[in-house]
């Protein structure tokens, strides 16, 4: 099985650090982390508009703030390595920078699982544009896309690739997981 993965909130539990970095950009510090997370789980663009943050301010400061947070505070989800080990090929499409992505993977000694990684530095349009997915699908014959947001799964559906929503029952997907220990009974056994 060849799997295309989202990174934040799918392989690694980075949302607490993403929310922390985003909150530093807000002038109103009374806004709850739950409210920020709710918007960020849709997309950063939705959160920027919702909280009335200037896009130029976000672009200039957010990734710098988030990258300063120690990788140890961005752990891999339990049992995700079982799925990574099972797959024949794993690839990533992320809006993170290449350096930040590689730093986290290296910190947790997980870079060896991935054949190819596409980051914001590679020049593809942001998800939900399907360009990066189409490139990886043509090259690696992707069987499944795993992500936690609608924008992660929409490009896969456009390309006719099966989808798996992680910790998000509110989005359309072929499979839904709340934990990766469900992967083999929910995804693999249903495809056998």
What residue ranges belong to the model's regions?
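Asp-based, Mg2+/Mn2+-dependent phosphohydrolase catalytic module
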Residues: 1, 102-192
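N-terminal helical cap/lid subdomain that shapes the substrate entry/recognition surface
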Residues: 2-78
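Conserved Rossmann-like nucleotide-cofactor binding loop
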Residues: 10, 17, 98, 151, ...
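Conserved SAM-binding loop
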Residues: 11, 90-93, 145-146, 176
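Alpha-helix C-terminal capping segments
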Residues: 22-27, 47-52, 79-89, 133-140, ...
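A mid-sequence interfacial segment
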Residues: 46, 91-112
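Short, acidic loop-to-helix structural element flanking the phosphoryl-transfer center
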Residues: 68-92, 98, 102, 130
């Amino acid at each position: 099985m060849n799997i295309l993965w989202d990174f934040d909130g799918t392989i690694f539990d980075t949302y607490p650090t993403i929310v922390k970095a985003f909150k530093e950009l807000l002038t109103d510090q009374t806004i709850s982390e739950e409210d920020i997370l709710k918007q960020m789980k849709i997309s950063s663009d939705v959160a920027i508009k919702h909280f009335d943050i200037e896009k130029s301010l976000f672009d200039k400061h957010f990734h710098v703030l988030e990258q300063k947070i120690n990788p140890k505070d961005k752990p891999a989800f339990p049992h995700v390595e079982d799925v990574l080990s099972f797959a024949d090929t794993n690839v990533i499409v992320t809006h993170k920078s290449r350096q930040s992505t590689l730093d986290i993977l290296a910190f947790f000694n997980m870079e060896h699982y991935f054949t190819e990684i596409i980051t914001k530095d590679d020049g593809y349009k942001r998800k939900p544009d399907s360009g990066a997915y189409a490139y990886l699908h043509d090259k690696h014959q992707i069987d499944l896309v795993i992500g936690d947001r609608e924008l992660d799964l929409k490009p896969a559906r456009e390309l006719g690739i099966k989808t798996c929503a992680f910790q998000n029952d509110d989005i359309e997907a072929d499979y839904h997981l709340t934990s990766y220990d469900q992967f083999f009974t929910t995804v693999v056994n249903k495809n056998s």
